[in-house]
Amino acid sequence: STSGTATEVTAFSIITDYEKGIKYPIADFEITPDVAIVDPDLAETMPQKLVAHTGMDAMTHAIEAYVSTANCDFTDPLALHAIKMIQSDLIPSYNGDMEKRDSMHNAQCLAGMAFSNALLGIVHSMAHKTGAAFADYGAHIIHGAANAMYLPKVIAFNAKDETAKKRYGEIADFMKLGGNTLDEKVELLTAHLRRMNDDLNIPHCIKNYGADSFPTEQGFVPEEVFLERLPEIAANAILDACTGSNPRQPSQEEMEKLLKCCYYDTDV
C-alpha cells in the first residue's frame, strides 16, 4: 500500500498511455468513495524511496490546493494543516520513524481532501506530461519525484502573480520560515522545499534524474531528446486538466521556458 496520493478520498484517477507517453487525469465525483478507512498500518511497509516520492506528492497537493483559483474557506485549513504535518513528519518518516509514518498517512489524506475540492495546478500538469514522455529511453519520471523537482520552479513562476505571492507568503508564515517581505518568504519557501528534496535523495532537475530516480551527474533523459520533444510536452501540459485552476495561465513560450528551468535547474 502507498501513502501520498489520497485516492481514497479524491475524485481523481490517472490513465497512462505508454505508447503516446502521456498521462491523462480523470476527474469525476462519481469515483469518490462514500467511506474511506485510513489505516496507517498499511503504510509501514513502504520502501524508503516510495516514502520520499509520495510524501512530496502530498506536499505538492497541499500547496497547489492552497494557491489554486478554486481555494475556499473549507479547503484552506486542510491544506495548511497538511503542509505543517508534512514539514515536520516526512523526513523522520523517511528515516524510519513509524509514528511519523502514521502521521504522514493522515497528512496525505488531509491534502487529498483539500485538492479534491480546490483542485491543483501546473506542477501536476507538467508531471503528468513528462512522466511517461521518455519511457522509450527505459525509465519513467516517477510522479512524486517530478512534483518535488518542479514545485520550487512553479512557485517562482506563479509568485509573479501578486495574489499567488501572498498565498505563498501565508504558507511560509504558517511553516515559520521567517522573512520580512513577500519576496523573501517565497524564496525561503522554495529553499526549504529544495532542502527537503536533498534530505529525501530527490534530484533538483530532469537533467540529473537517474533511471533509478536518484540524483546523478547525467540523467536518463538526453538533452537533445528533451529539447526535441519540448514543444509537444509544453502544449500537452497547457491542455492538462490541472492547468485551469493554476493562479497563472502560461503561454506556450512560458511553459517551454519553465520546463527548461526544470530540466537544467536554472532560475525562472
What does each of the following model-derived ranges do?
Residues 220-268:
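Short, amphipathic C-terminal "tail helix"
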Residues 1-73, 166-170:
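A glycine/threonine-rich phosphate-anchoring loop and its flanking beta-alpha core
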Residues 133-136, 140, 144-225:
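Gly/Pro-rich interdomain helix-loop hinge
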Residues 4, 109-147, 240-245:
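Glycine-rich phosphate/pyrophosphate-binding beta-alpha loops
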Residues 51, 55-58, 78, 82, ...:
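Catalytic-loop motifs flanking and including active-site residues across diverse enzymes
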Residues 59-63, 104-112, 126, 151, ...:
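Short alpha-helical scaffolding segments that buttress acidic/His motifs in well-ordered protein cores
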Residues 64-121, 131-136:
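Glycine-rich phosphate/diphosphate-binding loops and the adjacent beta-loop-alpha structural elements
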